[in-house]
A protein has these predicted regions:
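Beta-strand/loop edge motif enriched in small/polar residues
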Residues: 1-246
Length: 246
């Protein structure tokens, strides 16, 4: 647990996932394997970082290659040192750019960057005679969060970490009654304003056990006693999909 939904953590915390890609995490009593480099949630997981007024927005004006500042369509509370992502506005996925903020001005709408842009990110804004507005612009997202979960695996491995929220049944020995009791666990996770770095596992896994960064499996309908959600998080440098409800 790091913070509560109504009382988020304000300090900086890194959760570092270590271990070999060949070492599986095993459930007790021959309950099976959760796989390698995994946070297995069979109880409750709460991770809540500092919320932001805006986590992603769009460019207000074109950002040309060579520029060291960009103008946003919304005011943000981001600060110098934060990392951001600018999406491509052409057909080249490698024209997505990762930048670091050097300064924030004009009430939070102008970001000065630590290095010039490598590519142009366009904005198209048209108002038609009937009053309809067409606006297409590159997106700008905040990557930085004060809580980070990341893997020490190398990019060549393509096997990062994952968070598996699921259920589990086993028999637990009752020493008083001298018998085994059937016990059922069901996990839940409330996660907000967390940065996941190096998530997901690019491996050949069973259909119902794919290796997304966050895998929510067999949790049933939403329940007030197990209110699972993912809110305002960033997913950075992954090897599989960010999350899935299965």
């Amino acid at each position: 647990m790091l913070g509560w939904p109504n009382n988020p953590l304000t300090s900086n915390v890194d959760i570092i996932i270590t271990g070999s890609a060949q070492t599986n995490v095993l459930l007790p009593n021959d309950g099976g394997s959760l796989g390698p480099r995994v946070i297995g949630v069979l109880g409750g997981l709460d991770l809540h970082g500092i919320p932001h007024n805006v986590t992603w927005t769009r460019l207000a004006s074109p950002a040309l290659a060579g520029q060291t500042s960009i103008t946003l369509s919304q005011a943000v509370d981001w600060v110098a040192g934060n990392e951001i992502l600018l999406t491509t506005t052409d057909t080249r996925i490698d024209h997505v750019e990762r930048c670091t903020i050097a300064n924030v001005s004009s009430g939070g709408t102008v970001l000065t960057l630590t290095s010039p842009l490598a590519y142009t990110h366009t904005v198209i804004h048209n108002v038609f005679p009937n009053g309809e507005v067409y606006h297409a612009a590159g997106a700008v997202g905040l990557l930085t969060r004060n809580i980070r979960v990341f893997s020490q695996s190398t990019a060549a491995e393509k096997i990062g970490f994952r968070v598996l929220v699921t259920d589990y049944s086993t028999d637990v020995w009752d020493p008083i009654g001298a018998t085994y009791l059937s016990t059922y666990y069901k996990g839940y996770a409330r996660i907000s304003n967390v940065q996941f770095v190096g998530y997901g596992q690019f491996i050949d896994a069973p259909y119902n056990d794919k290796r997304e960064g966050i895998h929510l499996y067999n949790l049933g309908d939403w329940n007030a006693s197990r209110p699972t959600y993912i809110d305002s998080c960033s997913f950075d440098t992954g090897y599989y999909s960010a999350y899935v409800f299965f």
